[in-house]
Amino acid sequence: MTFLDAYPLVALLANEPAAAEVEELLRRDRASVATVNLCETIDVCQRVRALPAGEIRDALQPLLLVGTLVAVASGEEEAWLAADLRARFYDRKTLALSLADCLLLAHARMSGEDVATSDPAVIEVARSEGIGVVALPDSTGARP
């Protein structure tokens, strides 16, 4: 199983360069998404990509209902680890990790799963922490 950052789901819904790889990843194995990253996915799809909320729900709910995509809530342990990761790695200019990024990394590290992302900062910290990475192309097609 792989933990998905928000971007892979945005790419899937907005038909961006990583969409085919995300589809393959979901076909091959179940994937997880922290609820904070699911929220970010929905927000970006609506606010930035101007996708209607109904279309987003129609695309994501079947994946969630059949268990192809599992939404995972964050608890106290993930909160402590995410805060520790952000305190150790965050730098506004060189390594701008959001709290959502850190929760993604905390879930992946605690479960022993890989992360799928196109975010260079997430990839750098994941590798530093011994977390496996599925590096996806970003919205321009560039792979980190």
Predicted regions and their residues:
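Active-site neighborhoods of divalent-metal-dependent phosphate/nucleic-acid chemistry enzymes
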Residues: 69-121
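Active-site-proximal, substrate-binding regions of enzyme catalytic domains
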Residues: 42-88
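Short, well-structured N-terminal submotif of metal-dependent ribonuclease cores
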Residues: 1-37, 48-62, 129-131, 140-144
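Alpha-helical elements of the RecA-like P-loop NTPase motor core of helicases
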Residues: 20, 43, 80, 123-124
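Residues at the C-termini of beta-strands that transition into short coil/loop
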Residues: 35, 73-75, 137-139
